[in-house]
Amino acid sequence: MSVTDAELLEIREKLVKDETSEALILAKKAADKSPKEDGRAFELLGEVYAELADVKKARSAFKEAVSRSKNLTNDQGYEKYLWLAQINDNGSKALKLYQKGVTILERLLIDKGEDADLKKKIQGAYCSIAELFMTDLCMQPDAEENCELYTKLALQIDATNAEALQTLASMRISQQKIEEAKDALSKCLQSISRAATEDSVDLPTYAVRTSIVRLLIEVEMHEEAHQLLVYLQKEDDQILDIWYLLGWNCYVEAQNLQEQGNGSEEEIKELLMNAKFYFISALGVYQKIGWDDEGIKSHIQELLEILNGLGVPNMDEENEEAEWETSENEEEMDED
């Protein structure tokens, strides 16, 4: 017994439609009846588990897919290598997996000609490899050279792609070329705005846009960071990281204004009040959704202690005080 192309296509369609429960049932059935030399069903099963955030089962399925594909002369399953690379915590092994996936993608692109989806996959892989050389493999002698190379390759595919521009900005920050990083981030925001306006498939994922926010804060583009965060919040207001970053952005901006002596006392106070509001809101979301990251909770609590120590009022307290002062002034005017 073997699995048919039609069965595999149905699983893929379920995945595209986010019907993961149905996809899981079909993928398990397909994997059970797949011959030893066919890893396609296991590759899809791995993708389903990855979508369900079951990393352990995803890794097992992808490894089985790789094992069954060893003797194939024309392996077309690049996804298993890219996914395994993403969840591999060994930089050198992750690099080899990415390169294997890219090799397959490049071959498929030659066979199929112009294919936007394949190009996007290759571009994403190039960005991931560049990130590896900025993180896990940063101590290698040729790390900076390779980072430049893969970032350049990604931008050659599409110079307006937000993920590629984000990678460029991240690299420039690591090189202390802040103005060049800001330029890349400005172009990145233009790309995001254009994709959002056109409701395009080129709109970066929520996670990518959140990473872009962190870079914006790092280079002190606070207004742009706030605007992007507000947009992300409108998409989903139950994401803890967004509330935390809204607060962190205000807090860091207030610190910068104080250190540089560029802001008025009122402006700094307002930023710190906003930061406190966002941090309190973040704790509310934390409790509501049962988030399991104790680290971010501890940091928020630490920041709130600092703000309380500075005597920063809650927003409702400030509003009540303002209303009381207004009422008192009105009474004095009436007496006059």
Swiss-Prot record:
Pfam families: TPR_8
GO CC annotation terms, alphabetical: cytoplasm; nucleolus; nucleus
GO MF: protein carrier chaperone
Subcellular location per the Swiss-Prot or TrEMBL entry: Cytoplasm; Nucleus; Nucleus, Nucleolus
Entries under InterPro entries matching the protein: TPR-like_helical_dom_sf, TPR_rpt
PROSITE patterns (UniProt xref): TPR, TPR_REGION
Matches recorded under CDD domains: ACL4-like (cd24142)
TPR repeat start-end pairs: 39-72, 75-108, 110-143, 162-195
Keyword Nucleus: yes
Protein name: Probable assembly chaperone of rpl4
Species whose genome carries this gene: Schizosaccharomyces pombe (strain 972 / ATCC 24843)
